[in-house]
């Protein structure tokens, strides 16, 4: 397996798809990277030469990926929580942050249902 940005990318897939295994690189970014490196998108990773892999690695270094990106995202969330913004409060409470209705659904963010005991009549 070839390593790019500390991640083993699959050898059997096309390069443009394999690059998306790196956190922070989607399909469009992968296409831009390959264009910069001068590598055809349809080439399989196993068919790449060491020189082409080197050019791809250099192009990826220009982007913030993997650990650095994860760290930045977590620091951004911590900052929102510390300043007490609405988004920070939603993060702290584990509720949807982007304005979704949470009266009935939002189970992905809220977790499994917690039943509340009925008071006697």
Swiss-Prot record:
Entry keywords, A to Z: Ribonucleoprotein, Ribosomal protein, RNA-binding, rRNA-binding, tRNA-binding
GO terms classed as biological process: translation
Molecular function GO labels: rRNA binding; structural constituent of ribosome; tRNA binding
Annotated segments matching region Disordered: 92-121
One Pfam family in the UniProt entry: Ribosomal_S13
GO cellular component, one term: small ribosomal subunit
Compositionally biased tracts (Basic residues): 106-121
Domain of life: Bacteria
InterPro entries: Rbsml_uS13_C, Ribosomal_uS13, Ribosomal_uS13-like_H2TH, Ribosomal_uS13_bac-type, Ribosomal_uS13_CS
Family named by the database record: Belongs to the universal ribosomal protein uS13 family.
HAMAP family, per database record: Ribosomal_uS13
Function: Located at the top of the head of the 30S subunit, it contacts several helices of the 16S rRNA. In the 70S ribosome it contacts the 23S rRNA (bridge B1a) and protein L5 of the 50S subunit (bridge B1b), connecting the 2 subunits; these bridges are implicated in subunit movement. Contacts the tRNAs in the A and P-sites.
Assembly information from the UniProt record: Part of the 30S ribosomal subunit. Forms a loose heterodimer with protein S19. Forms two bridges to the 50S subunit in the 70S ribosome.
Name by which UniProt lists this protein: Small ribosomal subunit protein uS13
Organism in which the protein naturally occurs: Shouchella clausii (strain KSM-K16)
